[in-house]
Swiss-Prot record:
Disulfide bonds: none annotated. Belongs to the gamma-glutamyl phosphate reductase family. Pathway: Amino-acid biosynthesis; L-proline biosynthesis; L-glutamate 5-semialdehyde from L-glutamate: step 2/2. This is Gamma-glutamyl phosphate reductase. It holds the Pfam family Aldedh. Keywords: Amino-acid biosynthesis, Cytoplasm, NADP, Oxidoreductase, Proline biosynthesis. GO terms for molecular function: glutamate-5-semialdehyde dehydrogenase activity; NADP binding. GO terms for biological process: L-proline biosynthetic process. The keyword Repressor does not apply. It comes from Yersinia pestis. It is found in: Cytoplasm. It catalyses: L-glutamate 5-semialdehyde + phosphate + NADP(+) = L-glutamyl 5-phosphate + NADPH + H(+). Its EC number is 1.2.1.41.
């Protein structure tokens, strides 16, 4: 039995124990984790500094460096997120529906843990804590495989989690991490279907492709966010600029940040110079289509010609594609061709246009007069999220607690036999 099989077997055994825990016991463990994250913050931050130094030396982009960075404020927020998970309702054991059949059998459909979840992710140290806390709350064990960029940070945070579990009399194997950077171990994890019940990759398109093609475990993909906002012909310009500013500026490296702005041709001449002035204030580079370039070339913001490939990639930086479309249908067509089914928005004062856009755009989150930055487990009231699913089965959008459960049928009888 190799390393991964040992980890898988230990995780499966831990999952059976976790599935039997009361909500109070799970919350106790989460509270201890949150407290230890704070008391051991210097150890974790020092580990993160080692990862940051190595990442800078390797030439990592500023966008990815921002994702990798832990600050005292970010770590405190992560600890508070764990406490927020404590306060969330536990879905395990909840009766979804039920009925009394003509046969006399009382039938219930009840939420239960999935079992063991595997998560593969890149330069996102917060994922370690977010995923572990959600899995523990739902009675699932988890095997984590972070990128080599987060090696020391993940090592420190998993150590804290395992210490907390042991303090609460729970198996440390409930949260395990694959520490070796050997990529072969990822391939082995993808085939660990004897022990792992669901796999969640959080990374780029190449990782998602690898998991879809090689995994023998059910995979939930998502997190790649080529997010769009369409400025309709009757949008309120000043309010629209505020929404665009939030969607692009607040955290450019986030997967729910705005990447492509589509502007109705009827308002492009007036709106685009205003956009240029607003984006200039934040150092945003505009990547303009041939149609948009004449209205942006003399503006305040830096502008370059958009490349065809730009429409299909995440910038994750202070860059924004800008194109002009003839009408709402052209905007929808653009989103269908280039979007990733993550988060897309329309800015409009027309109720009929808003409803049409919502029905036509097939993304996991669609917004009317709101920023794409809202696609987040915390913002949706779900607590921390394990991922943002852009597929339709078994979960869609920010994956909170319910998405980490399945259900079983339970029948109660009085020595019933089938006639």
């Amino acid at each position: 039995m190799n390393l991964l099989e040992h980890m898988g077997k230990a995780a499966k055994q831990a999952s059976w124990q976790l599935a039997m825990l009361s909500t109070a016991k799970k919350n106790q463990a989460l509270a201890v984790i949150a407290n230890l994250l704070e008391s051991e913050s210097q150890t974790i931050l020092q580990a993160n500094e080692r990862d940051m130094a190595a990442a800078r030396e390797s030439g990592m982009s500023e966008a990815l460096l921002d994702r990798l960075l832990l600050t005292p404020a970010r770590l405190a927020a992560i600890a508070n997120d764990v406490r927020q998970v404590c306060r969330l309702n536990d879905p395990v054991g909840r009766v979804i529906d039920g009925s009394l059949l003509d046969s006399g059998l009382k039938l219930e459909r009840r939420r239960v843990p999935l079992g063991v979840i595997g998560v593969i992710y890149e330069a996102r140290p917060n994922v370690t804590i977010d995923v572990a806390s959600l899995c523990l709350k739902t009675g699932n064990a988890v095997i984590l495989r972070g990128g080599k960029e987060t090696h020391y940070t993940n090592q420190a945070t998993v150590n804290v989690i395992q210490r907390a579990l042991e303090q609460c009399g729970l198996p440390a194997a409930a949260v395990q991490a694959i520490e070796s950077p050997d990529r072969q171990l990822v391939n082995e994890l993808l085939r660990l279907d004897r022990y792992v019940d669901m796999l969640i990759p959080r990374g780029g398109a190449s990782l998602h492709k690898l998991c879809r093609e090689q995994s023998t475990i059910p995979v939930i993909t998502g997190g790649i966010g080529v997010c769009h906002t369409f400025v309709d012909e009757n949008a309120d310009f000043e309010k629209a600029l505020l929404v665009i500013e939030n969607a692009k500026i607040q955290r450019p490296s986030a997967c729910n940040s705005l990447e492509t702005l589509l502007v109705h041709q009827a308002v492009a001449k007036t709106f685009l110079p205003l956009l240029s002035a607003r984006m200039h204030a934040f150092g945003v580079t505009l990547h303009a289509s041939p149609l948009a370039m004449p209205y942006l070339a003399d503006g305040k913001a830096k502008v370059v010609a958009v490349e065809a490939a730009d429409y299909d990639d995440e910038w994750l930086s202070l860059d924004l594609n800008v194109d002009i479309v003839t009408d709402i249908d052209a905007a929808i067509d653009h989103i269908r061709e280039h979007g990733t089914s993550h988060s897309d928005a329309i800015l409009t004062r027309s109720l009929s246009h808003a409803e049409y856009f919502v029905r036509a755009v097939d993304s996991s989150a669609v917004y009317v007069n709101a920023s794409t930055r809202f696609t987040d487990g915390g913002q949706f009231g779900l607590g921390a999220e394990v991922a943002v699913s852009t597929q339709k089965l078994h979960a869609r959008g920010p994956m909170g607690l319910d998405a980490l459960t399945t259900y079983k049928w339970i029948g109660y009888g009085d020595d019933l036999v089938r006639s």
